[in-house]
Amino acid sequence: MAEPQQQLVDIDPDFEPLSRPRSCTWPLHRPEFSEQPGNSNTSSPAPSVKPEQGIVDFINSLSLLEETEDYPDEKPVLLNDFHCQDNCAHPQQQHPQQPNPQLTHPQQVPPLPAPASGSSPAAAQRKSSSSRRNAWGNMSYADLITKAIESSPEKRLTLSQIYEWMVKSVPYFKDKGDSNSSAGWKNSIRHNLSLHSRFVRVQNEGTGKSSWWMLNPEGGKSGKSPRRRATSMDNNSKFTKSRGRAAKKKMSLQGGLDGGSNSPGSQYPKWLGSPNSHSNDDFEPWGNFRTRASSDASTLSGRRSPFLPEEDEAAEVHIGYPGTKLGGPLPSLSEVAGHHGSENMMDNLLENLNLISPKNNTQGSQEAQTALSSPLMQGSPGYPSYTSPNMGPQPQVQQDYRKCLYGQGGVGGLNPISIPTLSDSKPGGYGPFVGQYNCAPGLLKELLTADADPRGELMQSGEGQPVLPSYASQGQMAQGGKMITHPHLHAHPRSLHQLPSPAMGLNGCAMLPHGHPVRLSSMKPQPHLPHHTHLGRGGGEAGMPSYTNGNGFHRHGAIAHHHHSHPERLPSDLDDMLIDQLDVECDVERVLHDTLMDGDALDFNFDPMSSQQSFTHSVKTSTHNWVSG
């Protein structure tokens, strides 16, 4: 240590390090110097430096500040101003209160001790002075309130009277009685009255008066009671008890649900994402909510969905019975394919899409009648015939719905696909009312290869000669009427004897009736001259004129059948199965709706071909309206 001290001295002998108490710390540091051998157990800030005597006296005076600031008899040289104010206040305070002098000043502090013996008296004085110190003295707010209540003759005071006593009796509060400066200490008095158990609040007998504050006759605690904290979920005993009861209830419910797992609620704890699966009881309030995040398909219960089951959409009105609805939902394509498998269904579709070429031209008209009288293409047999209600009994009433799949020109025939729900849901079946749009075998190939509008393609018979379809409503099956001529019809000179297909349009308009052939005979042998066509019909409704042009389209003149007022469309899943799966660019609804229903805006023009055996018709729509005569 000699070398560092020598170096410091050699550097600058005039600036020696001085030991001083650290600022901004509490309690104040009391240094012990190295020349005192009796107090060597305490460390010194700079033991190698010998301070001056004046500095030592100043430091010792500061170290005794906390023990000597409240006592009037102590008059250190450096603290005269501070103790002068204190001396002026204490005599005035002691007079009204009349306290015991020995209690206020238990012992007299001797004058400033010598530096050698200053530490031991200071430590003893610090241990003895353990009471709380305030600006008005050694008494707390509770002590002052107690003295104020004891000084009253009735041993009780109101809050305003306690304020008055504080201003009059305690010198520190004499100049703090106004409203601006009294807010702080009055608030402290109210807090002490409420927090301490030694004070009791008694209701005042008079009306509109504040309550009395009295001392607790049982004595109460001398100190402060524990502070009342705001209740929370952590320290609230009521919440703890309720949480314990909820945990017990949860355990009992889980035990009961394990025995009977058939109930829908038993699935909740077994789901890992359920709030009930957590072991922490803090999640217990979430158990009352329904689990929206879980999937209904992954659970055994079908009643866990948070959404109410929506009502099924209104079924399509049956074309045979206006206003009636389907008894059950239509099966989807996935359900239909589930019975036979998707591969089998696609095989059936491909088999029925065979592009059958027209038959040999040398075949007779009888074969053409046979081909036309067959329900659909040869790849899909088993379709029953349809008979008009005006012509006799129906051959088959209990008809499966799959047998009534329509054959639209561009879709072709379909193999009967099992749709069990449709035949089981309605006793009468749908066969007599949902007909089939018959087409000859060569039409599908023609539609797939031609560039013309698919609505303009007409059917060809197996003989290669055109089959001109006749459209008539169900009420026109057996009626007679006059015919009108079409000046632009060019037909082959030979007569076409056709046995029409027993089918019915999807919009309620039946096609050619069974057993009533339409004879298209040319009035003149020239192939390109206008001629009259006659529709051979049996007896039927009289006075119901029907108008037809040369191509065989029939319309009511005055009265439209009730089926016309109920346009129908196929079920959505059948549309998907027949159109989307086959990938044929043909809008079924548009063809049926525009072509068969909007008859007033149709005009058909036929362009002749040079071929004498077979020719193709192109149907062109125009805005020309029919004028009924």
From Swiss-Prot:
It holds the Pfam family FOXO_KIX_bdg. Keywords: Cytoplasm, DNA-binding, Nucleus, Transcription, Transcription regulation. Residues 90-107, 115-133 have a biased composition (Low complexity). PROSITE patterns: FORK_HEAD_2, FORK_HEAD_3. This is Forkhead box protein O1-B. InterPro entries: FH_FOXO1, Fork_head_dom, FOXO-TAD, FOXO_KIX-bd, TF_fork_head_CS_2, WH-like_DNA-bd_sf, WH_DNA-bd_sf. GO terms for cellular component: cytoplasm; nucleus. Residues 36-46, 291-302, 359-377, 385-397 have a biased composition (Polar residues). GO terms for molecular function: DNA-binding transcription factor activity, RNA polymerase II-specific; RNA polymerase II cis-regulatory region sequence-specific DNA binding. Its main location: cytoplasm. Residues 240-251 have a biased composition (Basic residues). It is found in: Cytoplasm; Nucleus. Residues 136-230 bind DNA. One of its GO terms (biological process) is lymph vessel development. SMART domains: FH (SM00339).
